């Protein structure tokens, strides 16, 4: 075997190792980036309750924007993902009231600051379910309700939700495909 053949084989071996190292590094970087995005920017959420029925059904898959409330304040009407001490499970609810707002419920309807809410998305009537109304939301808290009002575990039972428990905002439905689109 000539010296050129030995050098050629060593070169091929080094090339193969370099190629493997580059692949491992590339795949590792992709996994790290995907995990960072999943944990800190956008995530997938699955609807597991019927409390948003009419708007969201069990089994729907959503894209959650976890940066929404880092750069801006929550807004009335947002569909929020809640993960905090208020509940043992992650919840998906509609944000109804912000700090300083007064919530009232009369004759199955919701009133916000004395004005009846127009809620085309709401299914069923809304009763206080043990909540003393009218009720004023404290600073750093929000009031949430499920759209399926008669079958929802929400602020009527749990109390207000801390800003810190708002994991993110549901922005896009990705499953089922025929319902793909922005969530309102």
Where are the regions a protein language model picked out?
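Soluble "head" domains of membrane/secretory-pathway proteins
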Residues: 2-20, 25, 36, 40-46, ...
């Amino acid at each position: 075997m000539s010296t050129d053949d030995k050098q050629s084989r060593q070169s091929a071996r080094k090339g193969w190792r370099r190629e493997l190292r580059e692949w491992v590094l590339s795949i590792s970087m992709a996994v790290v980036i995907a995990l960072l995005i999943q944990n800190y920017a956008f995530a997938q959420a699955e609807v597991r309750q019927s409390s948003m029925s009419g708007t969201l059904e069990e089994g729907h898959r959503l894209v959650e924007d976890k940066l929404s409330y880092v750069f801006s304040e929550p807004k009335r009407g947002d569909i929020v993902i809640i993960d905090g001490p208020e509940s043992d499970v992650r919840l998906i609810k509609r944000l109804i009231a912000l700090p300083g707002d007064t919530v009232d419920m009369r004759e199955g309807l919701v009133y916000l600051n004395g004005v009846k809410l127009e809620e085309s998305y709401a299914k069923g009537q809304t009763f206080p379910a043990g909540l003393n109304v009218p009720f004023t939301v404290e600073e750093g808290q929000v009031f949430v309700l499920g759209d399926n009002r008669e079958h929802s575990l929400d602020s009527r039972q749990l109390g207000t939700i801390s800003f810190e428990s708002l994991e993110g905002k549901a922005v896009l439905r990705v499953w089922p495909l025929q319902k793909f689109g922005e969530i309102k």
